């Protein structure tokens, strides 16, 4: 943690003062006994008291880390057997500071009872015994270098056995990490590997998405190798796109980290280089991690220290409970109110289970499979996600998961495939593969906990979906807990697909609790999902829950607390809890005007008081309950109505809301949750009203945020939300108007009981939503309201004026009937009903009877005309309105009232002009009394408007009335006129003052005409422009005042320095500079003449005043002033006016229409008569009110509303709501269509389709390749089938007693995939890489036997071209051996198509040949194409490998003879090479091969029992060649350990026997192993040489084996099986390895010194013919070759067709190696027999 440098700086200053004052104190200044404390002591104490606690806190934190965490260091040097210069801990002996071997011995002699030196040296190094704990010395912050942006990460070095609770405390408290909702533990290969680009992209994207959406932690190994490198790449891509950092914790061993010394330091910031040293075995940390925990067990360069620590930490984190939300504790019974904004007691609502953990497997070695088993066996088990296609362990796990059955069982054939796959993948022996297979099958016993992610599969498109699905499957939790997990992860897709499934049982109330959590956490998709699955919001939402939602801490920051504080007009206590009544006051404050929230009405307050009142005595005192009672009500009525409110608390519906979506939308708006508010707006009734209310609330909150000097972003965001809701309201109105105009108008005028009994038009005006008012539907309604019941289209103004001036003309006007006004106001409806009730019904009935009689008298012909006439009469009847009704409707129309008031106002102004222009008499004239009466009655009308307004309290009524601009100006004008009238009635001089006030007052009444102009379509916008320009000019005047003052004061002070104090000075300052703005520059006063006297032309002398000091400055500053004022500021004002003009011009239509509404509503509510006749209307209204109170004492005055409200019944209201919901559905459907048809969406869909098509094409290509490979495999198997058919034909020929010669011909044509020595001889020629051809001549039996016949046509497909790949290396030493690793030479064997193609060459001189020694092999070879051919005997020959004179088949120089040990297990004889003459040609005959002398053979060859002639049984078809002259081209050093040659299919691999000296096999990589070599068996290889024999060979590897077998730590870590135990398990594993290696012998893994295991040589990437070609191929069953051979071996009566006649053997060739040696049956024993 960073140190408080300011505190340290202050403490340093305090120390300086302390030193100075201590010196002063020492001088004896304050040495009295009773003197006060010295000043330095006081300062020191103050500093300690103020700042030392923070310093002590920092020190305490540092000391806590040092006390809690330790490091381990090796304190006992035990030299390693591999490297004597290193200790067993991995460090050099010199790196052990303060320790030497002798010192360590002495220390151990003291501590361990004086053990002997031999015992100490034989002692094994142990962590517990030979390491020492000490406080950690490495923790702080890492700054990774080497990139464009230096990433930072926290780190700490801890012991490997640290308690996990300390680590969790470190992460949550010191590192300030939030407890995760998910823990993803990534495991995989430690060695670097490559992923497919598409798979890497999907893996990274899915991992980041899973971590971001769920708030997860990611655990990795921390180092920059293997799978961790791929995780770092994904984090790097995410960091470049998003600022949020994912919590990625790397748990790495301290001993494997490179540049450890750079990290040592306590609470430091260390730079760290990410470039790794290629020569070092250590690795660097990954720079994209956020935190590192470095586990230390005292070792260096070894993995394993982090395994136990990581697993224990994961286990401890999984025990922590997930807090899905943190809510204030709330009990409905006790009603305990805790703090919300301050420190409060919180009830952590968990899900009952701990943090879920999931293991993610990508690639990996054998140890990963053991880790998976450990996860699955844990309690509770940890689910595992395997990424198929990443390679190695992941693919093996995926294959086992796919083909294994329940209980971990697998098919026998698939078992063999899996074993072979394990062998080839990890280069394992059969025993090791079986051991790993057992572990794999143990994992498959819990395969339901394993989820396999396959890229492109239909089940899992993304890896994050696989991770979360695996967690839900493995959690074994109830449905509510699973839903809480999905809610915490914010993954609604998981909840929809995995939790809300058919047949799921839900406890009572569980979904409601989930709904509450979703609302608190602002999970809109979950709220929608829960509503779709049956959650009733009407039952869910109660008063307590809604209040709980208002007091939640979660969600975005909002201004609700500040609004409540403003409403309360004071600071709130720290433990204050917001109530719904407070929310009601806030809503009323934001809505403004006369809006009344339901939360503040009497019924709700009484209910709230009855429910929670006893525990909250101050709740109602803060509200002012009496403000909702109209002022005109008496006290008795108030008490009576309070007594009438009777609430049944037992009613279950009393605690619920009738419109829950309304309340939730308002909650979302006030809490600034826009997405949630939009969702609730779509549901429920009255969508248009909700949109307008939300628009007004957001706009008011934005205004409050800007007034409170909050961040501008808050105000801008709220304004944006307001515009969104306003746009929704307009679009919904447009949609409803398109469908039905009449119903759309009803939507605008019907009364909204849930929204303060207002209408949508009133809400739109309150929100100042000009676009809504300017809509065509609203304007049509306003036009009808403006006309009232008058039916006029043209010249309406003239007709109305004519009706006012000539009342009889009213009879000629047309009026509308009731059917033409379905959306009339409530007052008009009531009045119309009352008038219709008073009219007699008899004349109408009589008229109908007369019409019926007239119709009956008419004939059929004129029936239609009578019907038309009847319809016209009915229509005319409806248009007939009584005279009284016409007069009433005429004068009550707003347009008539407007012109009536306008004419009266014009008359008032004319009279006012008269009284101010003529001489004022002592007493007012008649004209003046009329003006006075007009102003007086106008004041009474203003008082009526205030009293008749909707707000309850008088003060609130006044505030609402004063919000209108013209009302304020009217009040000022009336008061000013009243003052003038009072002064006018007085004597002089007050009468003159009154007259002046009259003259000033008339100015306003002329300006008042602008309000009348607002009704005009053309003049209205200009009035709006004038108002805005006046506001702009006010800002300009302030700027102008500054410039004017600066010049005016300077000018006045210079020109008039001797002025006396007077108010004239203020006038003189502004007088001239102000008029200069308008062009009056006062030229004669700019530079008046002064100084010396001037003489005119006529000789007169003019005396000039003396010049003022500095008078020349005035013209200069005046020039600057005029430049700024006249040019700059005036033009600036013109530009501002121009901008305002264009701004208003663009919205002039909306502005005029909005002002028109105000005017229409004003005249709609005014009385009929204008002032001064309005007094009669007032008297009539008072009389009606008194009569109403006398008739109905209990009537509610609020029942009759004179506003623009439509009275409709409940059925009609339901129809209106249904119509509105249909409009919403249609609106969203059209919106979706527009979105889908937009260019951006089309481009996005097209890109997705192209990407999907590319993926499909890739899959098609992969399938095509696999089909090709399968076809090749089929070809190979067909060839094998042909081979079997050939064998069957041979057996049939033998049974039918065919002749020997014909049988031999047929047998000579049969071939095998695993080419034997006889087959090599039959190929007739060798083609070397240099282009030389070596032909082989067929042996001709002396007895006259026929030569080998051409191959049968049935066997022609078996002819192939086989090639030898040999490796050559000169016998060089040192670096030359490593440089010339191998030299490839290719020898091809071509089968002769006929005997005529075999060249008859002269025979070479007979000589003892030691060429092809055939040794029996205990392993059964299979029908393979690729084999290994080793030449072991040739290793001791001193022939130069580059000598071209040496025969390929082994005819060496005549001067050497070297014993060669046999490779047979029981062989003790040696084959000796005899000198012979060099053949003249490089060709050799077949006779030479068959006649070569073999002086000594093994006992198996020389002592064969007579009863079992090897030629009596059927000759085997498969052989391994153990000697070949081609081995001279092979390397003689074990370089093959580093890189194995790649063997092509259909090839032989010559491998030197010296490569087996140290029992090392040649790991062969094969391309196309899934196609050509799928049928290859790994058992068709030669057995390696015994360990005991390697010492007899020169250049053996007996001394430097450990140097060659050292491998990288990542390789060791992958091959080792992780264990949670310490060194005891390591010792057990070491002893078990030695025991296994001693039992396996030649067929098992060879164990060398230092416990380094080397697998025996096997054909890698191969399968036997009995096994399927690949894990995904179909199985094919065939008989084993060894089974056939076993059956044939028991058939003693059968004659071998290949057996030659003994008499045909020439003399002198008894020692020769014949073909019988090449086809020895005992060399082909079953492979399984050795393992069984």
Swiss-Prot record:
Gene3D superfamilies: TRPM, tetramerisation domain
Protein residues bound to 1,2-dioctanoyl-sn-glycero-3-phospho-(1D-myo-inositol-4,5-bisphosphate): 796, 1017-1018
Single GO biological process annotation from the record: zinc ion transmembrane transport
Required for the inhibitory action of G-beta/gamma-subunits of heterotrimeric G-proteins: annotated span: 617-625
Molecular function per GO: calcium channel activity; calmodulin binding; G-protein beta/gamma-subunit complex binding; monoatomic cation channel activity; phosphatidylinositol-4,5-bisphosphate binding
Implicated disorder: Neurodevelopmental disorder with hypotonia, dysmorphic facies, and skeletal anomalies, with or without seizures: An autosomal dominant disorder characterized by global developmental delay, moderate to severely impaired intellectual development, poor or absent speech, congenital hypotonia, dysmorphic facial features, exotropia, and musculoskeletal issues such as hip dysplasia, hip dislocation and scoliosis. About half of patients develop various types of seizures. Cataract 50 with or without glaucoma: A form of cataract, an opacification of the crystalline lens of the eye that frequently results in visual impairment or blindness. Opacities vary in morphology, are often confined to a portion of the lens, and may be static or progressive. In general, the more posteriorly located and dense an opacity, the greater the impact on visual function. CTRCT50 is an autosomal dominant form characterized by early onset. Affected individuals may also exhibit high-tension glaucoma and variable anterior segment defects.
Name of this protein: Transient receptor potential cation channel subfamily M member 3
Organism: Homo sapiens (Human)
């Amino acid at each position: 943690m960073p140190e408080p440098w300011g505190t340290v700086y202050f403490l340093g200053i305090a120390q300086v003062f302390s030193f100075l004052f201590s010196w002063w104190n020492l001088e004896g200044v304050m040495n009295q006994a009773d003197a006060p404390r010295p000043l330095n002591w006081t300062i020191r104490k103050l500093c300690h008291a103020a700042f030392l606690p923070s310093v002590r806190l920092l020190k305490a934190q540092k000391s806590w880390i040092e006390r809690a965490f330790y490091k381990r260091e090796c304190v006992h040097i035990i030299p390693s057997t591999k490297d004597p210069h290193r200790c067993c801990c991995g460090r050099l002996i010199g790196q052990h500071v303060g320790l030497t071997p002798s010192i360590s011995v002495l220390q151990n002699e003291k501590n361990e009872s004086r053990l002997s030196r031999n015992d100490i040296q034989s002692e094994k190094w142990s962590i517990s015994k030979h390491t020492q704990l000490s406080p950690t010395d490495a923790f702080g912050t890492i700054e990774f270098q080497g990139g464009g942006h230096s990433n930072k990460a926290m780190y700490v070095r801890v012991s490997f056995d640290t308690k996990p609770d300390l680590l969790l405390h470190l992460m949550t408290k010191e590192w300030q990490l939030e407890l995760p909702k998910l823990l993803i533990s990534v495991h995989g290969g430690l060695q670097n590997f490559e992923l497919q680009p598409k798979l890497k992209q999907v893996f990274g994207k899915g991992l980041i998405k899973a971590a971001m959406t769920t708030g997860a932690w990611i655990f990795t190994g921390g180092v920059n190798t293997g799978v961790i490198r791929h995780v770092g790449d994904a984090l790097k891509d995410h960091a470049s796109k998003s600022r949020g950092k994912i919590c990625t914790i790397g748990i790495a061993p301290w001993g494997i980290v490179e540049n450890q010394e750079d990290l040592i330091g306590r609470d430091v910031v260390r730079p760290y280089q990410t470039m790794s040293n290629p020569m070092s075995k250590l690795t660097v940390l990954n720079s994209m991690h956020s935190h590192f925990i470095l586990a230390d067990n005292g070792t260096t360069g070894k993995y394993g220290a982090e395994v136990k620590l990581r697993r224990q930490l994961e286990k401890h984190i999984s025990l922590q409970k997930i807090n899905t939300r943190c809510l204030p504790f709330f009990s409905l019974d006790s009603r305990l109110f805790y703090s919300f904004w301050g420190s409060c007691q919180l009830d952590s609502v968990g899900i009952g289970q701990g943090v879920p953990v999931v293991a993610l497997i990508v690639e990996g070695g054998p140890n990963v499979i053991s880790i998976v088993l450990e996860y699955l066996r844990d309690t509770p088990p940890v689910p595992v996600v395997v990424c198929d296609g990443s390679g190695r362990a992941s693919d093996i796990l995926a294959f086992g998961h796919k083909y294994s059955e329940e209980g971990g069982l697998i098919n026998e054939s698939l078992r063999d495939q899996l074993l072979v796959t394990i062998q080839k993948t990890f280069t394992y022996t059969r025993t090791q593969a079986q051991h790993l297979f057992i572990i794999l099958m143990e994992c498959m016993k819990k395969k339901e906990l394993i989820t396999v992610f396959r890229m492109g599969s239909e089940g899992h498109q993304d890896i994050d979906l696989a991770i979360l699905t695996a967690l839900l499957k493995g959690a074994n939790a109830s449905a509510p807990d699973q839903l809480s997990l999905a809610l915490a992860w914010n993954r609604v897709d998981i909840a929809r697909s995995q939790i809300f499934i058919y047949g799921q049982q839900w406890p009572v109330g569980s979904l409601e609790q989930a709904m509450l959590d979703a609302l608190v956490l602002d999970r809109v998709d979950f709220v929608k999902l829960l509503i779709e699955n049956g959650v009733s919001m009407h039952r869910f939402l109660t008063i307590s829950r809604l209040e709980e939602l208002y007091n939640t801490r979660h969600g975005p920051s909002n201004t609700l607390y500040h609004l409540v504080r403003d409403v309360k007009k004071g600071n709130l206590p720290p433990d204050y809890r917001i109530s719904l009544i407070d929310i009601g006051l806030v809503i009323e404050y934001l809505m403004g005007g006369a809006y009344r929230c339901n939360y503040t009405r009497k019924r709700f307050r009484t209910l709230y008081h009855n429910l929670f009142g006893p525990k909250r005595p101050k709740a109602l005192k803060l509200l002012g309950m009496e403000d909702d009672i109209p002022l005109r009500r008496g006290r008795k009525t108030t008490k009576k109505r309070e007594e009438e409110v009777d609430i049944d608390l037992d009613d279950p519906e009393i605690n619920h809301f009738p419109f829950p979506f309304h309340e939730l939308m308002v909650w979302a708006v006030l809490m600034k949750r826009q997405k949630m508010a939009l969702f609730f707006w779509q549901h429920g009734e009255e969508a248009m009203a909700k949109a307008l209310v939300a628009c007004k609330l957001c706009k008011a909150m934005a205004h409050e945020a800007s007034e409170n000097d909050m961040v501008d972003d808050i105000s801008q965001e709220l304004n944006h939300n307001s515009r969104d809701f306003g746009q929704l309201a307009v679009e919904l109105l447009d949609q409803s108007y398109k469908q039905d105009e009449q119903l759309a108008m009803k939507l605008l005028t019907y009364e909204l009981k849930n929204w303060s009994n207002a209408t949508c038009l009133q809400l739109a005006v309150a929100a100042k939503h000009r676009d809504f008012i300017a809509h065509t539907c609203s304007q049509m309604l306003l036009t009808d309201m403006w006309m009232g019941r008058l039916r006029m289209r043209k010249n309406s103004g003239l007709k109305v004026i004519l009706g006012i001036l000539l009342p009889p003309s009213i009879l000629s006007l047309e009026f509308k009937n009731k059917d033409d006004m379905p959306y009339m106001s409530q007052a008009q409806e009531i009045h119309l009903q009352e008038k219709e009730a008073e009219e007699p019904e008899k004349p109408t009935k009589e008229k109908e009877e007369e019409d019926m009689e007239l119709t009956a008298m008419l004939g059929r012909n004129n029936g239609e005309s009578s019907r038309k006439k009847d319809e016209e009469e009915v229509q005319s009847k409806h248009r007939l309105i009584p005279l009284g009704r016409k007069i009433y409707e005429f004068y009550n129309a707003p347009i008539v009232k407007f012109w009536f008031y306008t004419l009266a106002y014009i008359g008032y102004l004319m009279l006012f002009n008269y009284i101010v222009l003529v001489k004022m008499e002592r007493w007012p004239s008649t004209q003046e009394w009329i003006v006075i009466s007009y102003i007086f009655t106008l004041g009474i009308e203003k008082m009526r408007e205030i009293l008749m307004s909707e707000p309850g309290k008088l003060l609130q009524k006044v505030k609402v009335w004063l919000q209108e601009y013209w009302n304020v100006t009217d009040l000022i004008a009336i008061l000013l006129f009243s003052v003038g009238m009072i002064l006018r009635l007085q004597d002089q001089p007050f009468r003159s003052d009154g007259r002046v006030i009259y003259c000033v007052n008339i100015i306003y009444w002329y300006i008042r005409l602008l309000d009348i102009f607002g009704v005009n379509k053309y003049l209205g916008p200009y009035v709006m422009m004038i108002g805005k320009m006046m506001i702009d000019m006010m800002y300009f005047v302030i700027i102008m005042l500054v410039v004017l003052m600066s010049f005016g004061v300077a000018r006045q002070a210079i020109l008039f320095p001797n002025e006396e104090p007077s108010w004239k000075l203020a006038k003189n300052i502004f007088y001239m500079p102000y008029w200069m703005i308008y062009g009056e520059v006062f030229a004669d006063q700019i530079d008046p003449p002064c100084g010396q006297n001037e003489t005119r032309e006529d000789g007169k002398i003019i005396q000039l005043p003396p010049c003022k000091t500095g008078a020349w400055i005035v013209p200069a500053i005046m020039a600057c002033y005029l430049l700024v004022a006249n040019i700059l500021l005036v033009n600036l004002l013109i530009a501002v006016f121009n901008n305002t003009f264009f701004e208003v011009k663009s919205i002039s239509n909306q502005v005029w229409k909005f002002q028109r509404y105000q005017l229409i509503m004003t005249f709609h509510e005014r009385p009929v008569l204008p002032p001064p006749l309005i007094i009669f209307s007032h008297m009539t209204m008072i009389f009606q009110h008194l009569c109403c109170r006398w008739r109905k004492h209990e009537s509610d005055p609020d029942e009759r509303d004179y506003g623009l409200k439509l009275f409709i019944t409940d059925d009609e209201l339901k129809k209106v709501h249904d119509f509105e919901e249909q409009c919403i559905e249609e609106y969203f459907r059209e919106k979706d269509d527009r979105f889908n048809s937009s260019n951006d969406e089309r481009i996005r869909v097209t890109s997705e389709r192209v990407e999907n098509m590319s993926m499909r094409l890739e899959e098609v290509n992969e399938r095509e390749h696999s089909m090709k490979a399968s076809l090749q495999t089929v070809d190979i198997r067909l060839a094998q089938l042909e081979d079997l058919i050939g064998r069957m034909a041979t057996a049939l020929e033998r049974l039918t007693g065919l002749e020997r010669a014909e049988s031999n011909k047929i047998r000579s044509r049969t071939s095998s995939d695993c080419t034997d020595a006889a087959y090599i001889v039959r190929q007739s020629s060798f083609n070397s890489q240099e282009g030389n051809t070596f032909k082989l001549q067929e042996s001709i039996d002396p007895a006259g036997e026929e030569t080998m016949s051409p191959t049968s046509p049935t066997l022609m497909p078996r002819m192939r071209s086989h090639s030898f790949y040999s490796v050559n290396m000169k016998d060089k030493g040192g670096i030359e051996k490593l440089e010339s690793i191998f030299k490839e030479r290719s020898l091809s064997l071509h089968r002769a198509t006929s005997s005529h193609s075999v060249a008859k060459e002269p025979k070479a001189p007979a000589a003892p040949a030691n060429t092809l020694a055939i040794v029996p092999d205990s392993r059964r070879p299979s029908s393979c194409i690729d084999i290994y051919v080793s030449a072991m005997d040739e290793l001791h020959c001193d022939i130069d490998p580059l000598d071209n004179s040496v025969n390929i088949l082994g005819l060496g120089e005549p001067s050497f003879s070297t014993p060669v040990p046999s490779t047979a297990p029981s062989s003790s004889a040696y084959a000796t090479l005899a000198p012979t003459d060099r053949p003249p040609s490089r060709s050799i005959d077949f006779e030479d091969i068959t006649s070569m002398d073999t002086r000594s053979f093994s006992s198996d060859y020389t002592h064969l029992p007579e009863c079992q002639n090897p030629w009596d049984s059927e000759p085997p078809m498969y052989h391994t060649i153990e000697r070949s002259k081609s081995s001279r081209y092979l390397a003689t050093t074990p370089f093959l350990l580093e890189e194995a040659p790649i063997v092509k299919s259909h090839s032989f691999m010559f491998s030197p026997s010296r490569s087996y000296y140290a029992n090392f096999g040649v790991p062969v990589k094969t391309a196309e192993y899934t196609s050509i070599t799928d049928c290859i068996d790994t058992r068709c290889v030669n057995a390696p040489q015994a360990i005991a024999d390697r010492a007899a060979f020169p250049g053996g590897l007996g001394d430097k084996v450990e140097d060659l077998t050292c491998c990288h730590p990542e390789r060791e870590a992958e091959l080792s099986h992780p264990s949670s135990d310490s060194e005891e398990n390591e010792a057990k594993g070491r002893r078990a390895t030695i025991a296994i290696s001693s039992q396996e012998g030649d067929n098992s893994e060879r164990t060398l010194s230092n416990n380094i295991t080397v697998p025996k040589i096997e054909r890698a990437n191969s399968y036997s013919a009995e096994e399927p070609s690949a894990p995904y191929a179909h199985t094919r069953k065939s008989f084993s070759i060894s089974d056939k051979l076993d059956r044939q071996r028991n058939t003693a009566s059968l004659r071998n067709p290949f057996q030659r006649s003994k008499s045909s053997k020439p003399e002198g060739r008894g020692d020769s190696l014949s073909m019988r040696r090449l086809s020895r049956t005992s060399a082909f024993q079953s492979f399984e027999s050795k393992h069984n």
